[in-house]
Curated annotation (Swiss-Prot):
Gene Ontology CC terms, in alphabetical order: cytosol
Native organism: Rhodopirellula baltica (strain DSM 10527 / NCIMB 13988 / SH1)
Signal peptide coordinates: none
Record keywords: Amino-acid biosynthesis, Aromatic amino acid biosynthesis, Glycosyltransferase, Magnesium, Metal-binding, Transferase, Tryptophan biosynthesis
Molecular function as annotated in GO: anthranilate phosphoribosyltransferase activity; magnesium ion binding
Superkingdom of origin organism: Bacteria
Protein name (record): Anthranilate phosphoribosyltransferase
Residues noted as binding Mg(2+) 1 in the record, renumbered to the chain: S102, E236
Keyword Glycosyltransferase: yes
Binding annotation for Mg(2+) 2: D235, E236
Function: Catalyzes the transfer of the phosphoribosyl group of 5-phosphorylribose-1-pyrophosphate (PRPP) to anthranilate to yield N-(5'-phosphoribosyl)-anthranilate (PRA).
HAMAP family assigned to the protein according to its UniProt record, in alphabetical order: TrpD
C-alpha cells in the first residue's frame, strides 16, 4: 500500500477512488473525512462507499491514527485525578462466544488498587457486550459524564459507555447499520477512551489487526499498552496455547509470547468459557468473584496478572496471579463490583 497523495485534503469522491485503487490515505486526510462524518456534513452514500473501500483495501495505520484523532475531538471527556488509568477495551470480533473476560478483568484490577476506566458498548458481533453484562450486574451504564467522573475519583473504577460518550457517532449509525459489516469504526473504540486511559490491555481478533493497532498506539499518546492476540483466536490473554503480546511504550514496540506456564496456571480450553447471553455471563462473573474455582477464575486471574504487570504493580505474571487471587479470596473483588453497582 502507498500513501495516496501529499495533498492534505481530499474530497469524499477522490478518497473513494484512491482507496479503491489500493492507496492508503494519510492521517490528515482521514482525519478531515472522519471529522466531516461526525459533524453530519457528509453524504451517507459516500460515507458508506468510503468505509467499504477502506475495508476492502485494508485499513492502514495512518488511517487509524487520523480517524482516532478526529474521533477524540468529538467525544465527551471524563475528567479525573488519576496519573495511571487502565482500560481493558478490545476490538471484539473474535466470535469466540466467551463470557465477558475483559470486563471481569477490569473489575478485578480495580480491586487490586488500579484505577480503571472501562470503555465499552452493547454487543455488536458478540453474544454479550460489556454494557450488556454490566447492566445485568446492576451497573447503571447510562450515567451522566459528571457522575462517571465522580465514580472514577471516588471508587477508582467507572464504565465509559461508548453510546453515551461518543454522541457524534449518531451521524454514522444509520450507514453502519445498512453496511452490516465491520468497518474502520469498529477498530476505533479501543483508541478513543473518553477518560484518556494511560495504559491499555487491548485484545484483538486477528494478528494483522494486532499489528496495526499496536503501530497506531505508538503514534498516539499511550504511556504503555499490551496489544494481544491469542493463538486460539481469542482477543484476550488465553490459557489455551500461546498469547502474542505487543508491548507499546514511548513510541516503541516489543514482542512477547505467553503460555499458561508463564502464569503458573494450567491450560484452559476456550470451550469451557462459553456464555450464551449477558445474564449467563453475569452469573459467571458473580460466581468467580464469590470464590468459585475453575476455568473462569483462572482465565480472569491471567488477564488481571497481565494488567498488573502492565501498570507496574508487579514485576512478573505469577506475582500478578497471586495478588489477583488474593483480591478474589478476600472478597475485595466482590466488594468492588457492589460499589460499581451502587
Amino acid at each position: 500500500m502507498t500513501d495516496s497523495s501529499t495533498d492534505p485534503s481530499l474530497s469524499f469522491s477522490d478518497a473513494i477512488t484512491h482507496a479503491r485503487g489500493g492507496n492508503d490515505l494519510s492521517a490528515e486526510q482521514t482525519g478531515a473525512l472522519i471529522d466531516a462524518m461526525l459533524q453530519g456534513a457528509a453524504n451517507e452514500e459516500e460515507v458508506g462507499q468510503l468505509l467499504l473501500a477502506l475495508r476492502e483495501k485494508g485499513e492502514a495505520v495512518s488511517e487509524l491514527v487520523g480517524a482516532a484523532r478526529a474521533m477524540r475531538k468529538h467525544m465527551t471527556r471524563i475528567d479525573h485525578e488519576h496519573d495511571v488509568l487502565l482500560d481493558t477495551c478490545g476490538t471484539g470480533g473474535s466470535g469466540s462466544g466467551t463470557f465477558n473476560i475483559s470486563t471481569a478483568v477490569a473489575i478485578l484490577a480495580s480491586a487490586c488498587g488500579v484505577a480503571v476506566a472501562k470503555h465499552g458498548n452493547r454487543r455488536a458481533t458478540s453474544k454479550t457486550g460489556s454494557a450488556d453484562v454490566l447492566e445485568c450486574l446492576g451497573v447503571k451504564i447510562e450515567s451522566e459524564p459528571d457522575q462517571v467522573s465522580r465514580r472514577l475519583n471516588d471508587i477508582g473504577i467507572c464504565f465509559c459507555f461508548a453510546a453515551k460518550l461518543h454522541p457524534a457517532m449518531r451521524h454514522v449509525v444509520s450507514v453502519r447499520r445498512k453496511l452490516a459489516v465491520p468497518t474502520l469504526f469498529n477498530l476505533l473504540g479501543p483508541l478513543c477512551n473518553p477518560a484518556g486511559a494511560t495504559h491499555q490491555l487491548l485484545g484483538t481478533a486477528a494478528p494483522e489487526t494486532q499489528q496495526k493497532i499496536a503501530a497506531a498506539l505508538a503514534e498516539l499518546d499511550t504511556q504503555r499498552s499490551y496489544v494481544l492476540h491469542a493463538q486460539d483466536g481469542q482477543d484476550e490473554v488465553s490459557l489455551d496455547g500461546e498469547t502474542s503480546c505487543i508491548e507499546v511504550a514511548s513510541g516503541t514496540q516489543q514482542n512477547h509470547t505467553w503460555t499458561p506456564a508463564d502464569f503458573g496456571l494450567t491450560p484452559v480450553h476456550q470451550n469451557a468459557l462459553a456464555a450464551a447471553d449477558p445474564p449467563e455471563s453475569a452469573e459467571i462473573i458473580r460466581n468467580l468473584f464469590g470464590g468459585s474455582p475453575g476455568s473462569h477464575r483462572d482465565t480472569v486471574l491471567a488477564g488481571c496478572a497481565a494488567a498488573l504487570r502492565l501498570v507496574g504493580r508487579v514485576s512478573s505474571l505469577t506475582e500478578g496471579v497471586e495478588i489477583a487471587a488474593e483480591a478474589i479470596d478476600s472478597k475485595a473483588a466482590q466488594d468492588k463490583l457492589k460499589q460499581l453497582a451502587e
